[in-house]
Amino acid sequence: MSSKTARETEQRSSELQQSLAGKYLTFALATEEYGLPVLRVREIIKVMDITVVPQVPHYVRGVINLRGKVIAVVDLRLKFSLEAMPAGDRTAIIVVELDLPAGRTLVGVLVDAVSEVLNIVPDEIEPTPTFGDQVDTTFMLGIAKVKGTVKILLDLNRVFEAEGALPRVA
């Protein structure tokens, strides 16, 4: 690789790190830690009764009535092909705002446990690794190395932008 190409790659990586730096709400799924940009988070609620909706993707648990607004609830464990688990004491629903092709919408994301809000600085962020052509990593913003642990930073718009990823609710 020429020194000019190496400099350009390093500059793009630095720009990516700068653009991703900021506050993230971190949460656990199975044994991994993930992070969401805190500006996308509207609230965190305890698991409540979820109304099952027929003929939706397997990872859509159903809908909830949140102060008169019906929102879809997605089990991220199932969306990420992890083993399904019953709700525990620390299970929570993170209500996030997404900008999808159909418009701006609220979605409840079911997670094992909410951890903390972290201020992630540019030096702690690495670009998403490549795993070959067969693995889609477009939903990952990057990887953060914070306090000796790895956090997978998610772009929930990309997680859910696939056609039919979420049911239409009123």
Feature roles, as predicted:
Residues M1-A170:
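An acidic, low-aromatic, low-complexity terminal/linker signal
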